[in-house]
């Protein structure tokens, strides 16, 4: 951003009074532009013990497998965003969602929130951002997973299945910082 979002004047990079970080500040109207992390939200949808994955039709990681997920939109909760992304990417209805994994990814300026949910009626299809969608048994997951947060979520799920069986309500919330 080179220009003020409020008045259009050229913004300067400086440390505002009372702050400790350099930010873009408008010298004309004093508007401070804060760049904050983006929230990515999605679901780990389960049907008959199998996990719904989508093969990406877009970059980044075109052709790799991922959970249905995407950027949170203004005005929606993380849970609503996760359900929406599942509908958009996998033409699926996620129900009974609850927060399952939360990842801080500071080097990308992102937070990933994945909800554990049930796949309604086992129905799904490929949305416009997916080449295909498929159900996988935890023991049969593909090795070409798109993102570290997805791989870690799938690993947590496999361990929780081994520990708690199919009692999804017993699965704990996992919180992790990804640094690489």
Identify the residue ranges that each predicted region occupies.
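Acidic, metal-coordinating catalytic segment for phosphate/diphosphate chemistry
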Residues: 1-42
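Short connector loops at helix/strand junctions that flank enzyme active sites
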Residues: 21, 38-40, 46, 60-62, ...
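Beta-strand-connecting loop/turn residues
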Residues: 22, 48-50, 122
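Active-site donor-binding loop signature of nucleotide-sugar glycosyltransferases
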Residues: 28, 56, 69, 117, ...
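Conserved hydrophobic "DFG−1" position in protein kinase catalytic cores
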Residues: 45-46, 53, 117, 135
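Conserved Nudix-box catalytic region and its N-terminal flanking loop in Nudix hydrolases
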Residues: 46-88
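Unchanged
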Residues: 72-156, 160, 167, 178-180
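Short, highly charged C-terminal tails/helix-capping segments
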Residues: 171-175
């Amino acid at each position: 951003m080179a220009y003020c979002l409020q008045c259009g004047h050229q913004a300067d990079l400086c440390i505002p009074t009372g702050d400790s970080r350099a930010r873009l500040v408008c010298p004309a109207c004093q508007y401070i532009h804060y760049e904050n992390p983006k929230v990515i939200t999605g679901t780990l949808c389960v049907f008959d013990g199998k996990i719904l994955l989508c093969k990406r039709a877009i970059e980044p990681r075109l052709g790799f497998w991922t959970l249905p997920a995407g950027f949170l939109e203004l005005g929606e909760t993380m849970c609503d965003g996760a359900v929406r992304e599942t509908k958009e990417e996998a033409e699926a209805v996620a129900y009974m969602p609850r927060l399952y994994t939360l990842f801080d990814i500071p080097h990308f300026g992102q937070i990933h929130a994945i909800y554990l949910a049930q796949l309604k009626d086992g129905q799904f299809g490929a949305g416009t951002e997916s080449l295909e969608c498929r159900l996988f048994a935890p023991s049969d997951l593909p090795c070409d997973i798109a993102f570290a947060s997805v791989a870690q979520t799938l690993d947590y799920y496999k361990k929780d299945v081994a520990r708690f069986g199919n009692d999804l309500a017993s699965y704990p919330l996992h919180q992790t910082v990804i640094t690489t």
